[in-house]
């Protein structure tokens, strides 16, 4: 029983440490793609979190329905697109 609780707690900690989302370009829009996963992996491995610092995401892929790159394994302070604060095109 203790092992089961430990495993569940471990999964919860892993989920807390990793952020996911759509990376933003300099214009505040999602980075678009069609079916190019390699392009998105490159974009996701070099996400800006501050003006002068870059952080690496663990992986990325082209989300077909959204026609945009989607990144996984990002640090918590990485800037990602959010529909609530969308300033794309404005």
Swiss-Prot record:
GO terms for molecular function: sodium channel inhibitor activity; toxin activity. InterPro entries: LCN-type_CS_alpha_beta_dom, Scorpion_toxin-like, Scorpion_toxin-like_sf, Scorpion_toxinL/defensin. Expressed by the venom gland. Keywords: Disulfide bond, Ion channel impairing toxin, Neurotoxin, Secreted, Signal, Toxin, Voltage-gated sodium channel impairing toxin. Disulfide bonds join 29-88, 33-62, 40-69, 44-71. The keyword Secreted applies. PROSITE patterns: LCN_CSAB. Its main location: secreted. The keyword Glycoprotein does not apply. It is found in: Secreted. Belongs to the long (4 C-C) scorpion toxin superfamily. Sodium channel inhibitor family. Beta subfamily. Has the structural arrangement of an alpha-helix connected to antiparallel beta-sheets by disulfide bonds (CS-alpha/beta). This is Putative beta-neurotoxin RjAa2f. It comes from Rhopalurus junceus (Caribbean blue scorpion). The lineage of its organism: Eukaryota, Metazoa, Ecdysozoa, Arthropoda, Chelicerata.
């Amino acid at each position: 029983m203790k092992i089961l609780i430990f495993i569940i707690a471990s999964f919860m900690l892993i989920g807390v440490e990793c952020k996911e989302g759509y990376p933003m370009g300099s214009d505040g829009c999602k980075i678009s793609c069609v079916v190019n996963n390699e392009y998105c992996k490159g974009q996701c491995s070099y996400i800006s979190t501050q003006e002068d610092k870059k952080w690496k995401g663990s992986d990325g892929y082209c989300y077909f329905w959204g026609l945009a790159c989607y990144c996984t394994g990002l640090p918590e302070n990485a800037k990602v697109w959010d529909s609530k604060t969308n300033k794309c095109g404005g």
